Amino acid sequence: MSTRCPWVGELPIYINYHDKEWGKPQFDSQKLFEKICLEGQQAGLSWITVLKKREAYRAAFHQFDPIKVAQMTEQDIDRCMENTGLIRHRAKLEAIVKNAKAYLAMEKCGENFSNFVWSFVNHQPIINDVPDISVVPARTETSKAMSKALKKRSFVFVGETTCYAFMQSMGLVNDHINGCCCK
C-alpha cells in the first residue's frame, strides 16, 4: 500500500481527493474561484463535510461560473437554505455570491484571478519539508498577505487559515508529508 498523508484516512472520496487534487498546482481561474468559495464553507467544519457536498454546491452555484453566481438573488439564497445538500449557513452561502462579484470586479480592472493568487508564491509552488503532519502550520505570513489582499478586493470568508488551506489544496504550497506517494 502506498504511503499517504495521515489525514486522508480510508474513505475513497478522501483518498481520491488527496491523490488527484490536493497539492496539485491549479492555474485555472474558475477552479481557483470554486475552491476559495468552498474553503470558506469549511470555516469551523472539517473539509470532508464540504467535500461530500461539493457536487451539490456545484449544482446550486452554476458550476461556480462567476457571472451566473454574481446574478443570484436573495430568493436564490433562500432556496439554497432549503437545500439539504449544502451547509445551510446564510452568511456562508451569501459569501459565494459576494465573492463572485469581487472576482468579476477584479477581472473588470484587468486583474486575472489565477495570476493574482499565484503572485503570492512568485508563480512557483512552495515545496515544504514535512517530516510529519505536526510541523504543518495553519497559517503563514503569505496566507496572511493573501487574506488581506482578498479582503481589500471585497472577498469574504477568506481569513488567514482559510487562505492557507486554499494554498495547500490548489498546489501553491505542497504540504504532503515526506514519503507520501503524492509528494
Task: Please identify what each model-predicted range represents.
Residues 1-183:
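HhH-family (HhH-GPD) DNA N-glycosylase catalytic core used in base-excision repair
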